[in-house]
Amino acid sequence: MLSRRGHRLSRFRKNKRRLRERLRQRIFFRDKVVPEAMEKPRVLVLTGAGISAESGIRTFRAADGLWEEHRVEDVATPEGFDRDPELVQAFYNARRRQLQQPEIQPNAAHLALAKLQDALGDRFLLVTQNIDNLHERAGNTNVIHMHGELLKVRCSQSGQVLDWTGDVTPEDKCHCCQFPAPLRPHVVWFGEMPLGMDEIYMALSMADIFIAIGTSGHVYPAAGFVHEAKLHGAHTVELNLEPSQVGNEFAEKYYGPASQVVPEFVEKLLKGLKAGSIA
């Protein structure tokens, strides 16, 4: 009998041909008609909380199940929102304000990935588990936020997404529907399906290089991306403070602070591009 993870992977793989064609028509990895000898590699990067920690973004502590001293069941589940929407809104209001403090800035790792995108153009895709906007502020544009975005909210009835930089109050409603509906954070909570999974799995099937940065390897489906990339022949790289739960799956590994190991690896990769020799 298939596990929940197995059911999800099976469902995502069913329509590969149609989704692959759709991905080719989008910006990501679209220039496959270039002769093979002239091609730049297709690089897919996955980032987790470890890349933003050095910018001052506090991370969820899986060991004790707390996030900013709150139980995740209370502030990061649909059931928690149903029980106490004001608590949940207050929690994300505080996170939203923190993200916009002047001391919270992209670090050297974010800037290095923006430099890598500049070199690769539309053969680069960044998938992040983070809900902050530090990648965009560093200059990345080809970004999929699989866990949502803190500076957005969505209608709890229609799902329409709105940019939102201030606090959300009980009086704030979405008026896209016939009757005003409550707003909720545009964040994927525990028990909800991550966003953009069709595109992510198609990109994994087309990537030449897969790089995971600052991830724990505890949370699926993201923890399974390295295995999926390997199935399709990608070279795999882990850049992390310490080995992740799936660290043994990677062909190449570098450990240390993200602000150190990411710029170093990007420089190595760019030198290889210029020399015509990529891992």
From Swiss-Prot:
GO molecular function: cyclic-di-GMP binding; histone deacetylase activity, NAD-dependent; lipoamidase activity; NAD+ binding; NAD+ poly-ADP-ribosyltransferase activity; NAD-dependent protein de-2-hydroxyisobutyrylase activity; NAD-dependent protein lysine deacetylase activity; protein homodimerization activity
Annotated keywords: Cytoplasm, Metal-binding, NAD, Transferase, Zinc
Cofactor(s) of this protein: Zn(2+)
Superkingdom in the source lineage: Bacteria
Transmembrane segments: none
Annotated binding of Zn(2+), by residue: C155, C174
Annotated localization: Cytoplasm
PROSITE patterns assigned to the protein according to its UniProt record, in alphabetical order: SIRTUIN
Catalytic reaction list: N(6)-acetyl-L-lysyl-[protein] + NAD(+) + H2O = 2''-O-acetyl-ADP-D-ribose + nicotinamide + L-lysyl-[protein]; N(6)-succinyl-L-lysyl-[protein] + NAD(+) + H2O = 2''-O-succinyl-ADP-D-ribose + nicotinamide + L-lysyl-[protein]; N(6)-(2-hydroxyisobutanoyl)-L-lysyl-[protein] + NAD(+) + H2O = 2''-O-(2-hydroxyisobutanoyl)-ADP-D-ribose + nicotinamide + L-lysyl-[protein]
Reported phenotype of the disruption mutant: Decreased deacetylation of alanine--tRNA ligase (alaS).
Active-site residues, as the UniProt record annotates them: H147
Effect of R95M: 100-fold decrease in desuccinylase activity. 3-fold decrease in deacetylase activity
Keyword Repeat: no
Activity regulation (record text): Deacetylation is inhibited by nicotinamide.
CDD domains named among the record's database cross-references: SIRT5_Af1_CobB
Cellular component GO terms, alphabetical: cytoplasm
Residue sites binding NAD(+) per the record: 48-67, 129-132, 214-216, 240-242, 258
Domain text: 2 residues (Tyr-92 and Arg-95) present in a large hydrophobic pocket are probably involved in substrate specificity. They are important for desuccinylation activity, but dispensable for deacetylation activity.
Function as written in the Swiss-Prot or TrEMBL entry: NAD-dependent lysine deacetylase that specifically removes acetyl groups on target proteins. Also acts as a protein-lysine deacylase by mediating protein desuccinylation and de-2-hydroxyisobutyrylation. Modulates the activities of several proteins which are inactive in their acylated form. Activates the enzyme acetyl-CoA synthetase (acs) by deacetylating 'Lys-609' in the inactive, acetylated form of the enzyme. May also modulate the activity of other propionyl-adenosine monophosphate (AMP)-forming enzymes.
Quaternary context: Forms a 1:1 complex with acetyl-CoA synthetase (Acs).
Listed name of the protein: NAD-dependent protein deacylase
Native source species: Escherichia coli (strain K12)
Gene: cobB
